[in-house]
Amino acid sequence: RKHFLRFNGEPYRIVGIDGNPIYNTNPGTEHLEIGPSERIDVELTIDNTKQWQIESVDDNSAAENMVVKVIPKNIDEDNQSKTTETKDDVTENGTQYMDPIFKEIPTPDIEYDMLLGASMGMGNMEFTINEEIFPETEPFEVKEGDIVKATLINDSRFDHPMHLHGHYFQIIAKDGQKLDNPMVKDLINVKPGESYEIMFKADNPGLWAFHCHDLNHAAGGMMTTLEYQGYYSPFDIHENGNEPE
């Protein structure tokens, strides 16, 4: 599940997302939202005259003990301060501080729509892509060098952090509005009612998973594959039942 992190009200600067550097961002002091498997690098300068902490401020009792204390030397552990803030959303408006994959948005060779849904199946929740569950979901079929565009639409009441293995993609639009300063990621958390348009170059031949990183949703069917023409995986399903992503 996603988490909301607070750095005790200290100003911090986001310097990287999903392994990609971000430059010259403005400092923030609010809650930082991070989705399953998302990576966000931050830098901050601490007040070394007092103890403070990095903590989860999720509305979830299971996260109450997600706290990392930061204790400068010779400081009493009880000297603790807290603040109440709102949240920072690093995907809200894209960013003007990243190196894009595409400086000019090209015409895609292949386009896919991914309607992300949820419904009751045979006694369990099913999480669907275009009303199908894996392995019945339609794969992305590409050849090396293709420019691929995908539109992700969340038609459910759940967040879906969608993760593409083996590739980075550029987020070119949110809710139908083109982004002037697209982000480059390998995971995008699509919230209920949201849509994103992403684009990537098929430049890493293989058989790759594209799935929701809320792993309950992936296990419930929200997964597909990116398959390169001419690539064969020797993987076989053994008696233990392990299946490839």
Predicted regions and their residues:
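Histidine- and aromatic-rich segments of cupredoxin/plastocyanin-like copper-binding domains
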Residues: 1-95, 174-186
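Solvent-exposed loop and beta-edge segments used for protein-protein assembly and interaction
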Residues: 34-36, 46-48, 106-108, 142-144, ...
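Generic intrinsically disordered, low-complexity segments enriched for polar/acidic and small residues
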Residues: 9, 49, 94, 99, ...
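Active-site pocket scaffolds in enzymes
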Residues: 14-29, 113-245
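Residues at beta-strand starts and edge strands
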Residues: 1, 38-40, 110, 146, ...
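Extracytoplasmic/periplasmic copper-protein system
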Residues: 65-109, 220-245
